[in-house]
Regions:
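Alpha-helix boundary/capping detector
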Residues: 89, 132-133, 242, 286, ...
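Gly/Gly-Pro- and Ser/Thr-rich, intrinsically disordered tail segments characteristic of DNA damage-repair
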Residues: 4-7, 11-228, 384-443
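Residue-level signal for secondary-structure boundary sites
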Residues: 90, 124, 291-293, 365-367
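A glycine-rich phosphate-binding loop feature that marks nucleotide/adenosyl-phosphate handling sites
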Residues: 120-123, 218-221, 277-289, 351-364, ...
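Acidic, metal-coordinating catalytic segment for phosphate/diphosphate chemistry
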Residues: 311-443
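Nucleotide/phosphate-binding catalytic cleft detector across ATP-hydrolyzing
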Residues: 1
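DNA-contacting surface of Y-family translesion DNA polymerases
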Residues: 39, 165, 173-352, 371-372
Length: 443
């Protein structure tokens, strides 16, 4: 579609150019507008995540000149929430004036402009930026600022479509709402206010979404109970460390198993580097659409079939959990458990496209309780041999930990690809390329 559109643009420009011929090219809008003889061109810009992170750090440092860190929540590499309530009186500025001042300071120091959403709560600030600010005419510095409060939100956005434009409303939510005749935030708000005798009432939303309906109803009315203080004080009841990747082409069962081993070893090194241990591994493997394109295979396939977000038929993903005997960061134990889990849940006949791996219930290694263990003794167990076995396992763990630490030190000093295994050089292996990336993108 993009190629066809580009060809049409080139053809249209050729018709308008002097003599019907294009001479030279440009990707600059102003040059193209002033010189009809130039062909439309483009710039290929590979991602540079390390550079983006450096700019993100510099921008955050600029915000710190105005706002204390306890009033800033970094939402993503290019987005932050700021609670400026207590700063407006100090600076003698309105919220819009303070936002513009900070954005202009960022522009001066980094050359990057920004869009800002201002709201009476976190949700409205997010919606003001995501939906409203995009349609605001930028000033001479390219700055776009939009404001919302509960009243203006209802006046301006209760009839806005699609629902997926709103924060935390994905395709699944929107589809389920529309199947029940709810197409806008206004519809959801009115539904929540319905009486028990009506079809559209609060109970309908709770039947559809469970406890998540509470937040959906709040957002429909423009309310947000979460505050900056609540974000800063939040401590998750359970932590996890994980990674995932989308393979560049469909992988066979055997080749995907190689990727699972690679990912597991990298995950374990990450645990060791952070002094963490885990007692549970979770693996999710997504299959490729190519599996169902072969009519003969599709005829014989007896597994569950799902429809992806693009409307394509695809075998249901494989998902499983493996509980470990104890908290550990042992490469051998975790790799063995993950491989066993992979072999148990994945269909060997299917091609694989996505892999996600997580270590659940992670805690600091120092938190492992050193408690005495007790057992009923008998006359048939060689307790001396058993104690010797425990001692050998302890020594083995210590040797493995020393090797893990040595590998980490080498990688930190000489780069992530300084130490590799033979499997990392096999066809289809991805570790070397992923080590050159940050967050799945080119560094």
């Amino acid at each position: 579609a993009y190629r066809r559109q580009r060809q049409m643009c080139i053809r249209d420009r050729r018709y308008r150019s002097p003599g019907g011929k294009l001479q030279g090219s440009s990707s600059n809008q102003r040059e193209l507008r002033e010189h009809p003889e130039l062909a439309l061109d483009y710039v290929t810009a590979p991602p540079r995540m390390a550079l983006y992170m450096e700019y993100s750090r510099r921008i955050y440092a600029t915000y710190l000149k105005y706002i204390a860190p306890e009033d800033i929540h970094v939402y993503s590499i290019d987005e932050v929430f700021l609670d400026v309530t207590s700063y407006l009186k100090t600076y003698g500025l309105t919220s819009e004036e303070l936002a513009r001042k900070m954005i202009q300071q960022v522009l001066h120091e980094t050359g990057i402009t920004a869009t800002a959403g201002i709201g009476t709560n976190l949700y409205l600030a997010k919606i003001a930026m995501d939906i409203m600010a995009k349609h605001v005419e930028p000033d001479e510095d390219g700055v776009r600022i939009a404001k919302l409060n509960e009243r203006s939100y209802r006046e301006q956005l209760w009839n806005h479509r699609p629902l997926t434009d709103f924060w935390r409303v994905g395709r699944g939510y929107a589809k389920k709402l529309e199947e029940n005749g709810l197409y806008t935030m206004g519809d959801i708000a009115r539904c929540s206010a319905g009486s028990a005798q009506e079809f559209y009432n609060e109970e309908l939303l709770y039947r559809l979404f469970g406890v998540n309906a509470e937040l959906l109803i709040d957002h429909a009315w423009g309310w947000e109970p979460c505050t900056m203080e609540a974000i800063k004080n939040y401590k998750p009841s359970s932590n996890s460390v994980g990674s995932g990747q989308v393979l560049q082409c469909p992988y066979s069962y055997e080749k995907a198993g190689l990727i699972v081993r690679e990912m597991t070893e990298l995950l374990v090194l990450d645990l060791v580097d952070k002094d963490l241990v885990t007692n549970q591994i979770v693996l999710t493997v997504g299959y490729d659409i190519e599996n169902l394109k072969q009519s003969e295979f599709q005829k014989n396939y007896r597994g569950e079939i799902k429809t992806d977000r693009y409307g394509r038929k695809i075998p249901k993903h494989a998902h499983g959990t493996m509980n470990l005997e104890e908290y550990t960061s042992s490469t051998r134990k975790i790799v063995d458990a993950t491989v066993e889990l992979y072999q148990r849940i994945v269909d060997p006949q299917l091609l694989v496209r996505r892999i996600s791996l997580a270590a659940n219930h992670v805690i600091q290694e120092c938190e492992i309780a050193e408690t005495d263990s007790y057992e009923q003794m008998d006359l048939f167990t060689d307790y001396q041999a058993k104690e010797e076995q425990k001692q050998r396992e302890k020594e083995e763990r210590e040797r493995e930990r020393s090797m893990q630490q040595a590998v980490l030190e080498l990688k930190k000093k000489f780069g992530k690809n300084a130490v590799l295994k033979g499997m990392n050089l096999q066809e289809g292996a991805t570790t070397i390329e992923r080590n050159r990336q940050i967050g799945g993108h080119k560094a």
